[in-house]
Amino acid sequence: TDKNPVVFIQYGTGCPFMDIAHIKSCEAWGADGVIHFDPSWGARTEGFLEGYITHEEDGSIITYENLKSIKESLAPYTLWQVRAHRGLNTPETVVIAGKIGADLTKINIAYGSLSGGTDPERLTVDAVAAIKYAAEFSMPFDVVTNEELSGVPAYKAFAGMLIVSKLGLRLGGKPILQPLFCYSPEVMINGQMEDNYVDFNAAKIYCLRNIVNAPIWCGAPIGFLTQTEDRVQSSLMTALHASLASSLGVDGISIASSDEAFSKGPITAASRIDTLRATQASFRFFGHANMEPTENAKKWAEEMEEGIEKVLESVVKNGSFIDALYQGLLGSREDGAYPGRAGRNSVLTKA
């Protein structure tokens, strides 16, 4: 129905030609958009390689040639995102992606600094430039809260997301909020998902909607850490989270394949179709009907909002966003955050 969110699939097999094959399969089975995932080491490496390059690990290497070949393969209706959010090549990635014709990118200073391995000062400087470049290319960017996966509570992650989103607006950008639908360390410890996976995820959307009127794109991918090695269970979990997102009226979702969801191992084209078909079936099942969260959802949303306000007040009192990242105000070592070191001492200050 027209109420369902835009569905993005993640790709990053390591080989651009394999990526193209997977993308074309997903287009044929109804994907609205695709997201380029690069290797994690790319975020900690200055500069880019060039040429047509493949490797046998997770993520597809960013080169102009690799991205250009992928872009040329896309159907005209397929949205294309190249993530640039967490490393030493954040602004450069936005420029390359924008030149080639990407529709969207991904930038979050807090996540990249606290869980992505990049020095907070370096990433803040780079991200400001990246947001400006994204604005020049008219590329909206999502602000994902992946630091939740490290253990940072949702309210702290959301505070960081809101700061970066406000910065994006000030710089002429078009930020999109991307909270996680996941089984995070926070809920494992505190028990918010002992009964169901609905309430806490719904609380996130209620909380954000009560604070700001902004597009919401749930990720990343939805259902992270709820899937198992079983392809049926994995696909079902993705589909149920997709239906929850649709019930909550969000604008977009990112889904993984049924094997990619739990493993950094091989990703097969068939497993991509698993989750696309399951998501389609769940949308058909619910139609305009909705899931109904319990009263806990609104209670946790209120608690989340109070936590966000306290974090933002502490950042303002501190007086420096960069120092707040170093000091753990947006996620501490006790939470599971670890300020990155890649690019440390590389920022030059004018006298």
Regions found by a protein language model. Name each.
Residues 1-158:
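Active-site beta->alpha loop and helix N-cap motifs at the rims of alpha/beta catalytic domains
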Residues 113-268:
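Catalytic alpha/beta core domains of metabolic enzymes, predominantly
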Residues 25, 96, 203, 207, ...:
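Alpha-helical scaffold segments in soluble metabolic enzymes
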Residues 14-24, 95-99, 162-166, 327-351:
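Intrinsic disorder/low-complexity detector
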